[in-house]
């Protein structure tokens, strides 16, 4: 076991400031090569308008080496929000915001892929293109609802030529088609306009999946700016076509920017099975309200008051910095659905690129969706837990297994025998007590990222830092750290989980922050802290404490683009000895993800 901690004491290389995570940076608003004013509505003649220059170029090393092997992304071009995932007649459907024209934001349509296992995907022609007055500016994010009788319906936001937003509806053209390739927009679109007093017509988007209220009428929520508040506005309908606004929002707040991509669903404490919103909700269930705001996905746990027709959070926090997060990294615009095949709730998020705009143009692609995760409510009813769907384990091969390891201060244990660029690692850390833990400062909850940056892996602590060093070059000038620090708060532990990218690459022009989040640890109930990290070339997803904190990171080490090799280690740099009862790792095979699209781009 090597004593090789000198690498962590090196000056931070290319430390970037904590760049603001604007949803659409300024570079994506410029002209697009091959852009058009409209798109064909015929699924048999969809035009991609791809730049001939991009098509004729030999793929660059960055295009191939940084492209993921088992994450969802189209063969090329721009992708952002997941929209309307569902399971229907034997297939999972993943719709997504997609630019047919290139790897920059614009000309958005609804991409469409299908799968039988959530791992391997068949790419189809776009389900929705911008070809009507109410969506000529773009077919923006929305949801799918399964109506009584098994009729799926898409409700989505469209923008008109003046960029005013409204909600539109489409039905499958042929329900007997197992892929549901073609969708027909209703003639009276848009079905919902922002006509009520106090509404902003350019901040009215992203309708949720519908649910049925106690009166038998449909409900749905739409993200909006309303009388200066951020709100999930509530609407009712008897037929899912004609909607009226309820005189109060589902929930609103006066301290954040507009809420995008709201999600609302029922959960049972301690039950990792999902609940179908179209069925009766069992007694004791709670509800989760998620909103995408300021480049992160935040949520609250509470109850859906049927009499008031409103969401009531269990804990009201005026400071939104204290709201819980779905993911503490590069993760946004998540969307969940009830998986009737396996009786679970599954969630996806969009992970944007954090390299430069010129890198995206060189690669010819930008963005991906995270690994689908099962999401449920923990036993105490306070927070959501997430874990990669079991199906992803079908890609595992070449397992290595270590048991009974002991990591002393300064120890590095190299994990050999797997592809370090495509790996799944599960490791348990065992703590005997909190005796060596440093005191916890509650103010750290306001900015865990800053605390990860100040207390990096090179800063020795009482208990921790301990965790993984991944994607490390031979000379350690490039490496990413995923680790824990344990603090003591009264009689419980407070665990800080960090994914530190500040030394992840020698390349210039990258965003390389230190992401982080806290979770509680009760040593009387559990003696171990689990860490699972999936490495997929430029995407790293980590799950700490059984999914209490999840962090998605995008990394672009030069060693990967150069075709070099990388190393992976378990480490401890804290005063307390950390035991590792089990460490397992696998190489991950490549999935078949939209490799052969089921349609021709002319």
Curated annotation (Swiss-Prot):
InterPro entries: ConA-like_dom_sf, Fructan_Metab_Enzymes, Glyco_hydro_32, Glyco_hydro_32_C, Glyco_hydro_32_N, Glyco_hydro_beta-prop_sf. Pfam families: Glyco_hydro_32C, Glyco_hydro_32N. One of its GO terms (molecular function) is fructan beta-(2,1)-fructosidase activity. Glycans are attached at residues 174, 242, 254. Residues 1-19 form the signal peptide. Inhibited by sucrose. Keywords: Disulfide bond, Glycoprotein, Glycosidase, Hydrolase, Signal. GO terms for biological process: carbohydrate metabolic process. Disulfide bonds join 452-498. Gene3D superfamilies: Exo-inulinase, domain 1, Glycosyl hydrolase domain, family 43. Its EC number is 3.2.1.153. The active site is at residue 81. It catalyses: Hydrolysis of terminal, non-reducing (2->1)-linked beta-D-fructofuranose residues in fructans. Induction: In the first section of the leaf sheath expression decreases after 7 days of cold treatment. In the second section of the leaf sheath expression increases upon cold treatment. In the thrid section of the leaf sheath and the first section from the leaf blade expression increases in the first 4 days of cold treatment before returning to its original levels. In the leaf tip expression decreases after 2 days of cold treatment. It comes from the Eukaryota. Detected in leaves, with maximum levels at the leaf tip. SMART domains: Glyco_32. Belongs to the glycosyl hydrolase 32 family. Hydrolyzes inulin-type beta-(2,1)-fructans. Has low activity against beta-(2,6)-linked fructans. May play a role as a beta-(2,1)-trimmer during graminan biosynthesis. PANTHER family: BETA-FRUCTOFURANOSIDASE, INSOLUBLE ISOENZYME CWINV1-RELATED. This is Fructan 1-exohydrolase. The lineage of its organism: Eukaryota, Viridiplantae, Streptophyta, Embryophyta, Tracheophyta. The gene is 1-FEHa.
